[in-house]
């Protein structure tokens, strides 16, 4: 059984309700049909029901078991307006502005549904930027208790079954924080270890990646990773973690023996923490596009309720996978 099939099985054990607000995207319609067919989650779509069903007919898929909520006709609109206003009034939100946003911005509408406990999570981004998808989630849902920083990760399911957790890795931060400070990198390592345990396997082994291994290069970027590693050891001593290794020293035991003898990672990393968003974004896309890996994300970690992004280059199968992962995250909230 593949990694994502195991996640689907977990999702079915305690079925959750996930919002897919991008009802004008054919990949989303195809994914919604498959999700309800496989019993992975209950799906809410946002928009005009007639248009959505017309799209389903054109694609020859069955969306009869999908719930459609039209912001213009839902009896809960006033409740949602009040909830958005109360959540954001300190930032200048008015009831009038909240109503206008909810009638026109389906992403925000979906997030407010999650905030109101009318859905357990949301997945979007097939036709919106990461910023457009995640900004309202961060503004409305806030961080989970005890979490210092919201960050983004990818689950990378590779063909290299002798590495990672049977070929599966967690990459962070590949979608949100542009240039994390040492303190933020350490926090990302901690939340990534929790995400790994909840979604992939019991024993995260974390590499704080750099272009240097144990002082082989001198640069401010290297210093940042070294300091992040020191902070992580101090604040999160339970983590199996080391820095700063190059990628080969993180993944190949023979290279680790030569470059980083005595490292607790020892070439067996399954959680890769990138020094900045450039490295993380490029890294996951290289592994996906040239290495043939399945990439699920960017998934948010550290947020109060699960809202996850999609690459605009995603397939409908990717959406199914991210919804399954989101449903499992929702089981753990």
Which residues fall in each region the model found?
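Anion-binding alpha/beta catalytic cores of soluble intermediary-metabolism enzymes, centered on
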Residues: 1-266, 271-333
């Amino acid at each position: 059984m593949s990694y994502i099939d195991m996640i689907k099985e977990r999702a079915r054990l305690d079925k959750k309700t996930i919002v897919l607000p991008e009802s004008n995207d054919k990949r989303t319609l195809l994914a919604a049909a498959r999700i309800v067919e496989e019993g992975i989650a209950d799906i809410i779509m946002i928009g005009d029901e007639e248009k959505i069903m017309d799209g389903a007919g054109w694609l020859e898929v069955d969306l009869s078991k999908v719930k459609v909520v039209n912001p213009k006709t839902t009896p809960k609109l006033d409740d949602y307006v009040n909830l958005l206003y109360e959540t954001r009034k300190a930032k200048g939100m008015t009831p009038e502005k909240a109503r206008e946003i909810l009638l026109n911005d389906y992403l925000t509408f979906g997030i407010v549904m999650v905030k109101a406990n009318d859905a357990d999570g949301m997945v979007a981004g097939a036709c919106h930027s990461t910023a457009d998808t995640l900004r309202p989630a961060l503004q409305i849902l806030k961080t989970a208790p005890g979490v210092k920083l919201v960050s983004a990760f990818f689950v990378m399911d590779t063909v290299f079954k002798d590495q990672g957790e049977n070929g599966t890795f967690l990459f962070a931060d590949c979608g949100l924080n542009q240039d994390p400070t040492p303190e933020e990198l350490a926090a990302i390592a901690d939340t990534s270890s929790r995400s790994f345990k909840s979604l992939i396997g019991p024993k995260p082994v974390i590499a704080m990646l750099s272009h240097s291994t144990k002082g082989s290069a001198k640069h401010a970027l290297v210093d940042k990773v070294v300091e992040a590693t020191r902070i992580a050891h101090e604040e999160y001593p339970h983590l199996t973690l080391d820095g700063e290794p190059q990628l080969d020293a993180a993944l190949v035991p023979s290279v680790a023996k030569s470059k980083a003898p005595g490292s607790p990672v020892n070439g067996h990393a399954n959680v890769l923490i990138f020094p900045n968003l450039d490295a993380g974004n490029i890294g996951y896309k290289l592994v996906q596009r040239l290495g043939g890996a399945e990439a699920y994300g960017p998934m948010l970690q550290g947020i109060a309720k699960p809202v996850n992004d999609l690459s605009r280059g995603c397939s409908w199968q990717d959406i199914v996978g991210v919804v399954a992962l989101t449903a499992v995250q929702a089981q753990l909230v």
